[in-house]
């Protein structure tokens, strides 16, 4: 027995500890990650009209956005409603939790004496989690008290939750640490309230409206800046707007006469002309009045004399009464229209066009102009250019109806540019060589079939445009145009060029839409056999046997052309052969050679170059289709 008592006493003696005691073991606090605490407000009474009718529309609330918060949270908005009707301050109801379901409801009353911003925690503190029994009792009491208040209030029938009441008297902005989306979940109760639309997806400044019943929420700005609300003394108070506007017309100024409009200023010369015309009109009117008076006087005198003669009475001649003419006076402030009338003249279209062209020529003559442009006048005949024959340098007669080359152009001695595009001209006269200083000549889109030899006598010609005509071949005399730099022969049925073109110094050659491709060369160079007289004449000339034949026979042996290869006499047409070369920036330009005999034909067929130009230059020839083993049919006749 004693031993047991001793053991019990021994066990009751605690050993002396040399360290701090451990804290008591408390039950583990569960991690309520998904549980959300809801703020609940006490129901308020219905507002009166004079209470919410005096709200300041300039008040606004700002909510700061935090970039650390997930952007997938629900959008928020705020609405201004009045909950405390005894106090004149406004309160804002906001939702502090994003989710509605699976949350516990509890009440959080914010006192009116709060003067600063509030920080709403994400979850409750640890002490509230531990003493949940006490909190549950507090909830029950709050529910009972709220039920009593709901029964006392006849207008409110449903309890609001998930809301936080913020008084209007908060003058300080929310702290920067509280950066969350706030969504409005408050549904106003009663028949006098209207639901506000939901704003989703963005935020904006929320103004406090005058009428809470018809207040429409605006988005809250997404900027991170926080602007403090203005003080009550700085806000503008609404003033009663007048319901009726009375306009007093008794104080209007008396009616005044409108000032007389001032006539526009006129040039001195125009004023002088108008004054002279007015004076002439006045003189004519005076002359007409005098004539009328004289006629009336003569008629009256004759009538009186006849009456006296018939009656046989001798009465003294009485002066006739003068005719009185009333003159209308024009006041200084009267408006007078002054102008000139033009009588309509019946004229045909050709006469009108001819008058316009004549006027253009007269203007060139008066002002000393050296260019005349009559493009697009559709002239059937060229006007007389004699007045400007020595001064015109540029003449454009394109897009007209000239059927023939205008002879009037040949008298323009100093003409340098002549354009005759789009005219139905069929022939160019050989007298065109009279235009000695002509540099640019364009006669495209006509019906020209042949270029005259006089055209090749223009030593200063630099550009020749004969495109889209009906030219089939060009004379070898083109080699005389040593100043020619640009030749345009597009759109012509031409198959080849003469050898004289190799002597030119062309910079640009255009041969588009022509028959110059190699498929037409063989057909274009087909030869016929020479006549016997032509062969004999060529044999006598080359062997110098003309002195041994009679004169009658010698006259028939005259040569009319020259061989393009040996430059000797050529009787008849001779033989034709096409060789191509790359020249003037164009590849495979076909050159048609007219030779006198089969010997020259064989030589030019086998050669690979030609010497042309001044100074003489070597031009390579392409050995394309002429490399056939079979000799042309012309050789069988020799």
Curated annotation (Swiss-Prot):
Stored InterPro entries: Leu-rich_rpt, Leu-rich_rpt_typical-subtyp, LRR_dom_sf, LRR_domain-containing, LRR_R13L4/SHOC2-like
LRR repeats: 389-412, 413-435, 437-458, 460-481, 482-504, 532-556
Repeat in keyword set: yes
Pfam families with a match to the protein in the record: LRR_14
Domain of life: Eukaryota
Region named Disordered: 220-241, 306-325
Keyword vocabulary terms for this entry: Leucine-rich repeat, Repeat
Protein name: Leucine-rich repeat-containing protein 63
Upper taxonomic lineage: Eukaryota, Metazoa, Chordata, Craniata, Vertebrata
